[in-house]
Amino acid sequence: AAGEMLFLNNPLSIVCSLVCDHEEQCEGHCVLGKKGAPVHFSAIENYISSTYSTKMVKGPAPSNGMRVAIVGSGPAGLTIAVILARYGYQVTIFEGKDKIGGVLRYGIPDFRLPKTVLDDFEDRHLIRKGIRVRPNTTIGSAIGIDDLFRDGYRAIFIGTGVWQPRALHIKGETLGHVHFAINYLNNPDSFRLGERVIVIGAGNAAMDVARTALRKGVRQLTCFSRTPEVAASQHEFSYATLEGVNFEYCKAPVEITDEGVIFVDVRED
């Protein structure tokens, strides 16, 4: 079946159907798009994946007697865990946060990737397959790599992700009203942003921050782009515009003050 083919090739196909930049990938390379509208692969993939997922009720595969540890439950860790369990490996996932998903759960807003999708994935493709999850467990503190090998794990996959924000390295970046996007998306409800917000950048992450902030009560939000066009996909840009996000172009930040951000104009030759 089409659903089985998708899942065997990519266990996270249902996630990809929702969050991948299809404009630059499958739909962007569709030959029909040269003369008209491309095939809407994302909608097709989502329908097939979600329909097939509800029928996935098989239990664990016969054990081959070998243990494998997965450190981190982001997209890489989840994919490898499912594939290894398919071949009979006894898989345990060690996750530093309270729930699985990594950047999928803590870096992508719910309006783009509903958390229920990840919860259903955990139930159908982890728990029912015999994959064990140890949440709130950081490898390197109470438990180390040597401890895992001592307890019979034959292999360890480390997929802890890249959670470090990209700093601007400009004056004022440490002020109290300045926040990094990845930190904000991790838990928006813990931030008090006020009514007017500036987002430095215009990529897909900036669109996520902007649209989330508007949903959390921000009244005026402007994204500043260094270039004449946004780096975000047209799809995300269109949604942000419809929801009230403003844009300024060819602006580069040089300093952050208590009153706001100082920008300079960027000229492109």
Regions found by a protein language model. Give the residues of each.
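N-terminal Rossmann-like FAD-binding beta1-loop-alpha1 element of flavoenzymes
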Residues: 66-92, 206-214
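A Rossmann-like FAD-binding core segment of flavoenzymes
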Residues: 116-166, 177-189, 193, 215-269
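Conserved hydrophobic helix-helix packing surfaces used for dimerization/oligomerization
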Residues: 68-70, 91, 178, 197, ...
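Residue-level detector of alpha-helix initiation sites
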Residues: 11, 74-76, 99, 203-205
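Glycine/serine-rich phosphate-binding loop and adjoining beta1-alpha1 elements at the start
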Residues: 1-60, 125-127, 133-135, 146-183
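A short, charged/proline- and glycine-enriched loop
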Residues: 61-68, 194
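Predominantly flavin-linked oxidoreductase catalytic cores and closely associated redox partners
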Residues: 193-221
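Glycine-rich FAD pyrophosphate-binding loop
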Residues: 89-105, 221-230
